[in-house]
Amino acid sequence: MEKPRGVRCTNGFPERELPRPGASRPAEKSRPPEAKGAQPADAWKAGRPRSEEDNELNLPNLAAAYSSILRSLGEDPQRQGLLKTPWRAATAMQFFTKGYQETISDVLNDAIFDEDHDEMVIVKDIDMFSMCEHHLVPFVGRVHIGYLPNKQVLGLSKLARIVEIYSRRLQVQERLTKQIAVAITEALQPAGVGVVIEATHMCMVMRGVQKMNSKTVTSTMLGVFREDPKTREEFLTLIRS
């Protein structure tokens, strides 16, 4: 029996033909150009890359992509146990990356307070869940944040919210650490900021070297945390206590 044109089969299951390299594609909606001369201190107020409307619009395409993955693995997306899997996986992936729908200004605008406090503020052991952008598998761990105020303080729960916004994206741990520190610095203009992340990467546990007990530790030190060894040591001692 002749196969329908425009359709190919993988492991006996029909699959939509992928566009050939170089083939014309629908024009993508261009993003507005970034404003020139923007001040670095305003970078934390940048717009969100994804909206709820984008989620609804892209969910069918994302589910179709998961169906294609199942076929390529030799599975039948139509069997009972997998009937709803593409939609579940698509919805889950949108949740895992929901940080793209949020901005720092959403969280911080009403939670920055004038306060004459000049001693270190630390929130440690903040649970963190993120997705490795290289293998699309999770890495999980804890985040420790400290900053030295400069006439302003931040609501403590907002530090955890900053972690949530940046970790719920496709990430590498090194960049995540720096993004958290830079966001706090640009929003508060403190004397200094320190961020340390300890995480276990599933791409090292479930594949590759398969080391169950390995942890990756990254740090970013800004301001006096970078320039003054005593301040840095105080922070590192307190998060270990």
UniProtKB/Swiss-Prot annotation:
Biological role: May positively regulate nitric oxide synthesis in endothelial cells. May be involved in dopamine synthesis. May modify pain sensitivity and persistence.
Sequence positions bearing Phosphoserine: 51, 72
Keywords noted in UniProt: Allosteric enzyme, Cytoplasm, GTP-binding, Hydrolase, Metal-binding, Nucleotide-binding, Nucleus, Phosphoprotein, Tetrahydrobiopterin biosynthesis, Zinc
Pfam families from the UniProt entry: GTP_cyclohydroI (PF01227)
Assembly and oligomerization: Toroid-shaped homodecamer, composed of two pentamers of five dimers. Interacts with AHSA1 and GCHFR/GFRP.
GO terms of molecular function: calcium ion binding; GTP binding; GTP cyclohydrolase I activity; GTP-dependent protein binding; GTPase activity; identical protein binding; mitogen-activated protein kinase binding; protein homodimerization activity
E.C. number: 3.5.4.16
Stretch list, region Disordered: 1-58
Functional pathway: Cofactor biosynthesis; 7,8-dihydroneopterin triphosphate biosynthesis; 7,8-dihydroneopterin triphosphate from GTP: step 1/1
Cellular component aspect of the GO annotation: cytoplasm; cytoplasmic vesicle; cytosol; intracellular protein-containing complex; mitochondrion; nucleus; protein-containing complex
Site (Involved in pterin ring binding): 87, 96
Name this polypeptide is given: GTP cyclohydrolase 1
Top EC class, one word: hydrolase
Post-translational modification note: Phosphorylated.
HAMAP family, A to Z: FolE
Induction (UniProt): By cytokines such as insulin, interferon-gamma, and phytohemagglutinin in adrenal gland, macrophages, and T-cell respectively.
